[in-house]
Curated annotation (Swiss-Prot):
This is Methionine aminopeptidase. The gene is map. GO terms for biological process: proteolysis. It holds the Pfam family Peptidase_M24. One of its GO terms (cellular component) is cytosol. Gene3D superfamilies: Creatinase/methionine aminopeptidase superfamily. The keyword Zinc does not apply. Its EC number is 3.4.11.18. It comes from Borreliella burgdorferi (strain ATCC 35210 / DSM 4680 / CIP 102532 / B31) (Borrelia burgdorferi).
Length: 251
């Protein structure tokens, strides 16, 4: 992982342009999430949209990954490889994507419902998404990384969901993955560095319906909940500007 590098306001504007295009890409994918569509078809939609807008997909070819998006269905947490699998009513699918625009990287994820889902799954998505914003609110000068982590954990814990521990948020902007790591639970063994002006982070809670443990499928990429419970994942690229958090991956 590339070391921490703070960004100037001009550089943050360029990351914002990348992240805004990324947000539009996810909207384009979302419009096509219906029962019967395959995750590969969604991948091609994202690829075409990014290329049409004179940018590059950040994931495609990264450490050998074949997709433009990670499409993780139901019990799959992250890094799902797009393929022939067709979405069905009652599924959920996490779409994680990255964009490189003019050399600047952004990273974003949302979990979408396919048709009608069980109320417990609705609650999982609602809580995971809300926890992201609780974490973002703590990304301000004067705080430390674990203030973000604790806010996410404190919000999720009363609901009894399992917070994934093996994977974290991270710095982003000049590269796809930069320092620091941003865990989604209070983990004192992580580097608890100070939040600084010009810091850009990808904050991304990953939360399972039941237990927190995860495993990796035989494809070497797809991470899934070990107890096969459904999993949600939400992520934004966020910068510290004038001491406060500014979400870059919103339109």
């Amino acid at each position: 992982m590339t070391k921490l590098r703070l960004k100037s306001k001009d550089e943050i504007k360029k990351i914002k342009a990348s992240a805004s295009l990324l947000a539009l890409t996810l909207l384009e994918v979302e419009r096509n999430i219906v029962p019967g569509i395959s995750t590969k078809e969604l991948d091609l939609i994202a690829y075409d949209f990014i290329i049409k807008n004179r940018a590059k997909p950040a994931f495609k070819g990264y450490r050998g990954f074949k997709g433009t998006i990670c499409a993780s269905v139901n019990e799959e947490v992250i890094h799902g490889i797009p393929g022939k699998r067709k979405l069905a009513d009652g599924d959920i699918v996490s779409i994680d994507c990255g964009v490189i625009l003019d050399g600047f990287y952004s990273d974003m994820a949302k979990t979408f419902k396919v048709g009608n889902v069980d109320s417990s799954i609705d609650k999982l998505l609602e809580v995971t998404n809300a926890s992201l914003y609780k974490g973002i609110a703590e990304m301000k000068v004067g705080n430390r990384i674990l203030n973000i982590s604790k806010a996410i954990e404190d919000y999720i814990k009363p609901f009894g969901f399992g917070i994934v521990r093996e994977y974290t948020g991270h710095g982003v902007g000049f590269e796809l993955h930069e320092e620091p790591s941003v865990p989604n639970y209070y983990a004192p063994f992580f580097k608890n560095i100070r939040i600084q002006e010009g810091m850009v982070l990808a904050i991304e809670p990953m939360v399972n319906l039941r237990g927190h443990k995860v495993s990796i499928k035989s494809d070497g990429w797809t991470v899934f909940a070990s107890d096969l419970s459904y999993s949600a994942h939400f992520e934004h690229t966020v910068a510290v500007v004038d001491g406060l958090p500014l979400i870059l991956s919103e339109v």
